């Protein structure tokens, strides 16, 4: 067998390759599109947009270049992953703020409600007309016997699903969250869970992984999604992960790394990563992108988190969504402003990012800056529904 040409090693399943790595597999040369391990190039290659980790290339050749040219001719240009995908048409960005259904819930009717306007009212009766999606948060516990802050799942579904259908408003079912975990060890129980909320208005299922799920728990969720997708081809499936927004090449937390590895090891390709672009902690360059005052620039930090996910993990922008926390964050010197809405929305549209959400619907009314509140924005100058409408306008919805 002929030796590999210089700088072209034989592909090995035990080696992790990063974007740009060149290998030889069964006599052909391949270039890595992003981080990959265990995906053999000969059976996992394709051009731009294919979702495959390898591209067949002529980056190194067994044939010496003809004189006088000192280097081989360049390969056919293929846009690398960092190249932004074409922006989606106006109005195609997924947009649905999170609604903690236990906040301002009408416990007599179980109808999802809010007090944003000053009076406890069903969300569907007071939301801005152009807001066409709401993310229900959070179902916790084991799939099939989940609970919503003590409410039985059947009660939540029966009181709200048909109302959303009648109103022509989509909804996403979000699980987990900071205060509770969601687990699922059975495909049958997962189908019970999904079907409970199924309707023409169900847009997708979201897994907010914050509350200490084990690696096995996370792997089970990925397996459930992969098995369920063929039964529910119209749904979106997202994993919501904490992130930093600074200059670190890899910005996800430990649970995020575990989730990305589970997605890759299970071969899941139809998924969305939703980044929690909030609560970065200390204002240092590794945590967030700093402004001229030395504080976290929340719009640019959110963008940096998406760029890191795209560049390090190879996630296409079309499979990334971003969820900032509007107004004051848990760290009192971090404030996501109305100006940040414009900055982030413009970048999302220009780069073909899948969607934007925010935390949370009940916070979209004014109160003075200070510690974060569950029922107002700790910002003070946006007005009632100010952030909701600012995103609608900036995204062209």
Listing of model-derived features with the role each one plays in the protein:
Residues 23-24, 31-32, 94-100, 131-138, ...:
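Structural recognition of the beta-strand scaffold that forms the well-ordered cores
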Residues 2-74, 79:
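Tryptophan-rich substrate-binding surfaces of secreted polymer-degrading and adhesive proteins
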Residues 1-2, 86:
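Sec/Tat signal peptide C-region and signal peptidase I cleavage site
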Residues 89-199, 222, 341-355, 361-394:
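N-terminal carbohydrate-binding/catalytic regions of secreted carbohydrate-active enzymes
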Residues 27-47, 139-141, 178-179, 327, ...:
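Acidic glycine-/aspartate-rich tracts in secreted/extracellular proteins
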Residues 21, 137, 142, 148-151, ...:
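Substrate-binding and catalytic surfaces of secreted/luminal carbohydrate-active proteins
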Residues 105-107, 180-182, 214-215, 245-248, ...:
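Eukaryotic short linear interaction motifs
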Residues 145-269:
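Substrate-binding cleft of extracellular glycoside hydrolase catalytic domains
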């Amino acid at each position: 067998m002929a030796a590999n040409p210089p700088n072209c090693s034989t592909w090995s399943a035990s080696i992790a390759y990063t974007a740009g790595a060149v290998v030889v597999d069964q006599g052909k040369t391949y270039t890595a599109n992003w981080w990959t391990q265990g995906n053999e190039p000969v059976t996992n290659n394709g051009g731009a947009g294919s979702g495959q980790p390898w591209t067949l290339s002529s980056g190194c050749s067994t044939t010496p270049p003809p004189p006088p040219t000192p280097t081989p001719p360049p390969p056919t240009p293929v846009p690398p992953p960092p190249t932004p995908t074409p922006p989606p048409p106006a109005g195609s960005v997924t947009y649905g703020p999170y609604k903690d259904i236990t906040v301002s819930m009408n416990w007599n009717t179980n109808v999802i409600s809010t007090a944003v306007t000053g009076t406890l009212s069903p969300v569907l009766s007071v939301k801005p007309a152009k807001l066409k999606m709401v993310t229900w948060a959070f179902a916790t516990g084991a799939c099939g016997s989940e609970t919503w802050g003590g409410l039985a799942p059947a009660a939540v579904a029966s009181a709200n699903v048909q109302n959303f259908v009648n109103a022509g408003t989509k909804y996403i079912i979000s699980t987990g969250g900071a205060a509770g975990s969601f687990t699922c060890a059975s495909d049958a129980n997962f189908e019970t869970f999904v079907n409970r909320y199924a309707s023409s208005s169900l847009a997708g299922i979201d897994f907010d992984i914050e509350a200490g799920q084990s690696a096995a728990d996370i792997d089970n969720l990925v397996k459930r999604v992969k098995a369920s997708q063929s039964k529910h081809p119209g749904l979106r499936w997202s994993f919501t992960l904490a992130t930093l927004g600074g200059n670190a090449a890899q910005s996800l937390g430990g649970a995020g790394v575990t989730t990305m590895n589970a997605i890759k090891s299970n071969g899941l390709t139809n998924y969305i990563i939703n980044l929690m672009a909030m609560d970065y902690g200390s204002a240092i360059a590794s945590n967030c992108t700093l402004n001229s005052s030395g504080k976290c620039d929340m719009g640019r930090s959110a963008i940096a988190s998406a760029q890191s996910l795209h560049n390090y993990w190879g996630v296409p922008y079309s499979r990334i969504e971003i969820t900032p926390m509007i107004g004051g964050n848990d760290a009192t010197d971090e404030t996501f402003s109305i100006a940040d809405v414009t900055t982030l929305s413009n970048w999302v549209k220009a780069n073909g990012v899948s969607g934007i959400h925010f935390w949370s619907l009940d916070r979209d009314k004014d109160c003075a800056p200070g510690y974060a509140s569950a029922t107002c924005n700790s910002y003070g100058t946006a007005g009632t529904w100010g952030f909701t409408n600012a995103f609608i306008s900036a995204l062209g919805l």
